[in-house]
Swiss-Prot record:
The lineage of its organism: Bacteria, Pseudomonadati, Spirochaetota, Spirochaetia, Spirochaetales. Keywords: Aminoacyl-tRNA synthetase, ATP-binding, Cytoplasm, Ligase, Nucleotide-binding, Protein biosynthesis. It is found in: Cytoplasm. ATP binds at K622. Its main location: cytoplasm. This is Leucine--tRNA ligase.
């Protein structure tokens, strides 16, 4: 009797798949559209840490569906690649002195080994790497399309700069501390510095990015996050004149009806008009305030928890309807990059304005009330209501009506207009870094931009030894004079030295998978028409906004230019839940690393002080030493065990904690299948009952895979395997279809069993998914309700016709029943055949 040697089996079939290119995909024109499917994983960033057990969860889900579709005769595109440009590799390179390209390619090698060890059905001939010049040539090509369409421009923008590190930092690399912002690396002081940046006009697509969400099958939570990020609001843009000046200040408001209650204006400290209108005696305070407040991040400036601060400019604005003079302040809670960078403040009807007015003793004028009467305000009234304390033509009106009247008056008097505003800001696209796509633009002496010609692409990233920060805030590329300075038609030009962000390569990678070796175009129209859109996209919810929004934006631009055939790139989106791990917390709530914890009598204690710890569920992290390495799991239990366990832990979209005991249970399950394989394989007919159970299992597994309910599909397989173990023989008519429906979950074992039965490998090429016969499904079970004194305590499944004595015995041994009848006297037990049992107690 042979043992289940998973190591040997898994290596054998992985080698076979590689050698025979089992999963290579072609665009067969004879396969109809309804029999083609594009299943996509969010491709990984190849970090130095390699995969942990959380990464393969989504990959396993798509792999099961891919194999299921192959067995159902589909042409399946299921590719993989690497998002290999970006900041982490560059930072790691700076720390270690190893070139980012070398680091990246070493990491990719490790990732590929780990991914292949899990037996995923990827077409490796379609592998892409965003740092490969044959890939980023087309990223640059798309950038030029954006530029020529007027969607890419340059502007000076404030960025974080660290003088000690000599580099620009991203928001994620800056920590806010009580002593001001600091660099995460080295904990140095940082400041804001204006730098010329490339920006993409994503705002031009704001409305379509909201509207077209209706056309795609995405989680409502993700749609809401995108809508909130875009932040559409309808209101009015109103123009306030500055007293004794030609300057005008535009504000946007969703409540134009409250214009009669405006008692001050607030400008962003960086607003361009501030220097022009500030009175001389107030300038020192303005300068000091600006220097202090602009050090803060946008998040900190706008936080509802933070105290609102401001400084008076000495200037006044004129209310366009009432003619009242109102003071103009600056306040850091207003951002220059949002809306007009100015707000009209109505403290009686806005919480933030109310707080500011109270702090600085500014007037509070009520112009809306619930009843239409003046009320004593202890807090702002922010709801709709009835207008009060307004000019007669606007008084005593409901909010919606006065809004329309105010907008009509402003429009007729050329003081404002109806406006739709978006919270979404244009995308700052450039980075002052080395490890990214060079931007294909050259500049003349006056900084006029000249795009490269398409035949000049790719503009290659030069391989340099010194990729460390320049010290000036410019990209390290700025130091390479023979690369930066170029001659053209007798004139000298400079190359753009900023690079693209990591998001650039991931904006369109799903298209390059269609035609990864095409040197003449980013993908042929024929292949785009053959596969697009992506039918199923699986990835983490952390990408709900940025990656998914940016990819949708680029796709819409490509659609407008006629390069793609769909308005949306991803038809259906699923976010897999996070796989967490156990962590340990002391009495003060401090998390203790796992290697400092010991277990005694099912309790957990600190090795340092022997104090008891609380076991909690937490995200896997290096600091907590609770990361599970898939290499270790595969070595001890096999890839098939790990795949099935990750799917069995719970619903795909739920977060769930890793528990190795559960994995051991799955390993035993696969060994049970091997035990059945070791029984005598017979062509004899199986009993009607076991055939019925097989068809029930086929039905359940089929429906569950279609609905991505992998955990319940596995559960039904387990139930059926336990039933088969009761039989002395291994029936071919049962084992063959069982092997097919098992194979998407455990492909290595599936291949081995398929070959064992004398079939031609690969199972995913030669087998056909079995169909269940409804006529053969005999339901011999019944749900029995367990009651105590007429109240339901539990429900159990028993065979149809279970006799009364057996039913009583089973009920009295039921855990929930036993809990509820302790110390009670049983008066009688009432049974209704195949329906219920009621235990009467007192």
């Amino acid at each position: 009797m042979s043992e289940y040697n998973f190591t040997k089996i898994e290596k054998k079939w992985q080698d076979y798949w590689d050698k025979h290119k089992t999963y290579k995909v072609n665009e067969d024109p004879n396969i109809p559209k309804e029999k083609r499917i594009y299943i996509l994983d969010m491709f990984p960033y190849p970090s130095a840490n390699g995969l942990h057990v959380g990464h393969p969860e989504g990959y396993t889900a798509t792999d099961i569906l891919t194999r299921y579709k192959l067995l159902n005769g589909f042409n399946v595109l299921h590719p993989i690649g690497f998002d290999s440009f970006g900041l982490p590799a560059e930072n790691y390179a700076i720390q270690t002195g190893e070139h980012p390209k070398k680091i990246t390619e070493k990491n990719i090698k490790k990732f590929k080994e780990q991914i292949k060890a899990l037996g995923f059905a990827y077409d490796w001939d379609r592998e892409i790497r965003t740092h490969d010049e044959n890939y980023y040539k087309w990223t640059q090509w798309i950038f030029l399309k954006l530029y020529k369409k007027g969607l890419a421009y340059t502007k000076e923008m404030p960025v974080w700069y660290c003088p000690d590190l000599g580099t620009v930092l991203s928001n994620e690399e800056v920590i806010q501390t009580p002593d001001g912002p600091r660099s995460e690396r080295g904990f140095h002081k940082v400041k804001r510095k204006p730098l010329r940046q490339w920006i993409l006009k994503i705002t031009e697509y704001a409305e379509r990015l909201i509207k077209d969400l209706e056309e795609i099958d995405w989680p409502e939570s993700v749609k809401e996050m995108q809508k909130n990020w875009i932040g559409k609001s309808t209101g009015a843009e109103i123009e306030f004149s500055v007293k004794a000046s030609k300057e005008k200040i535009k504000v946007f408001t969703t409540r134009p009806d409250t214009i009669f209650g405006v008692t001050y204006l607030v400008l962003a400290p960086e607003h361009s008009i501030v220097d022009k209108i500030t009175k001389d005696e107030f300038k020192p305070m303005i300068v000091e305030y600006r220097e202090r407040e602009t050090l803060k991040s946008d998040l900190e400036r706008t936080s509802l928890e933070k105290d609102k601060t401001g400084v008076f400019t000495g200037a006044y604005a004129i209310n366009p309807i009432t003619g009242e003079e109102i003071p103009i302040w600056i306040g850091s809670y207003i951002l220059g990059t949002y809306g007009t960078g100015a707000v009209m403040s109505v403290p009686a009807h806005d919480a933030r304005d109310f707080e500011f007015a109270k702090k600085y003793n500014l007037p509070i004028k009520q112009v809306v009330s619930q009843t239409g009467n003046n009320e004593i305000l202890t807090q702002p009234f922010t709801e709709n209501g009835i207008s009060i304390n307004t000019p007669e033509e606007f008084n005593n009106l409901k909010t919606d009506e006065i809004k329309e009247r105010v907008i009509k008056w402003l429009t007729e008097n050329k003081k404002g207009q109806k406006k739709v505003n978006y919270k979404l800001r244009d995308w700052i696209f450039s980075r002052q870094r080395y490890w990214g796509e060079p931007i294909p633009i050259i500049l003349d002496d006056d900084l006029n931009e000249i795009p490269l010609e398409e035949d000049e692409l790719p503009l290659r990233l030069p391989e340099i030894e010194n990729y460390k920060p320049s010290g000036t805030g410019e990209s390290p590329l700025s130091r390479i004079q023979d690369w930066v300075n170029i001659k053209r038609n007798g004139k000298t030009y400079k190359r753009e030295t900023n690079t693209m962000p990591q998001w650039a390569g991931s904006c369109w990678y799903y298209i390059r998978y269609l035609d990864p070796n095409n040197d003449n175009e980013f993908a042929s129209k024929e292949k785009i028409n053959y596969w697009m859109p992506v039918d199923l996209y699986i990835g983490g919810a952390e990408h709900s906004v940025l990656h998914l929004l940016y990819a949708r934006f680029w796709h819409k631009v490509l659609y407008d230019l006629g390069y793609v055939n769909t308005k949306e790139p991803f038809k259906k989106l699923i976010n897999q839940g996070m796989i967490t791990s156990f962590a340990y917390q002391d009495e003060n709530g401090i998390l203790i690393p796992n290697d400092e914890v010991e277990k005694k009598d099912n309790k957990f204690f600190s090795k340092k002080n022997n104090k008891e710890l609380k076991q909690i569920v937490a995200k896997m992290s290096k600091s907590l030493k609770n990361i599970i390495n898939p290499d270790d799991i595969i070595k001890e239990y096999g890839a098939d065990s790990m795949r099935i366990y990750e799917m069995f832990m719970g619903p795909l979209t739920d977060s769930k904690p890793w528990n190795t005991q559960g994995l051991i249970g799955i390993f035993r399950f696969l060994n049970k299948i091997w035990t059945i394989k070791n029984k005598e394989l017979t062509k004899e007919s199986a009993s009607k009952e076991i055939i019925s159970e097989l068809h029930k299992t086929i039905k359940k597994v089929t429906e569950d895979i279609e609905n991505l309910n992998f955990n319940t599909a596995i559960s039904s397989l387990m139930i059926f395997i336990n039933e088969l173990l009761k039989h002395d023989k291994n029936y071919l008519e049962i084992f063959k279809p069982l092997t097919i429906i098992l194979s998407p979950f455990a492909p290595h074992l599936g291949e081995e069993l398929w070959e064992y039965m004398g079939e031609t490998p690969s199972i995913f090429k030669s087998a056909k998914w079995p169909e269940y016969d409804p006529n053969l499904i005999i339901d011999n079970t019944r749900e029995i309700v367990l009651q105590i004194n007429g109240k339901i305590k539990d429900k159990i499944i028993l065979n149809k016709g279970t006799n009364e004595e057996a039913l009583k015995s089973i009920a009295l041994k039921n855990h929930k029943i036993m809990q509820n009848i302790q110390n009670k006297q049983i008066i009688k037990i009432i049974t209704v055949k195949d329906k219920l049992i009621n235990i009467v107690t007192r």
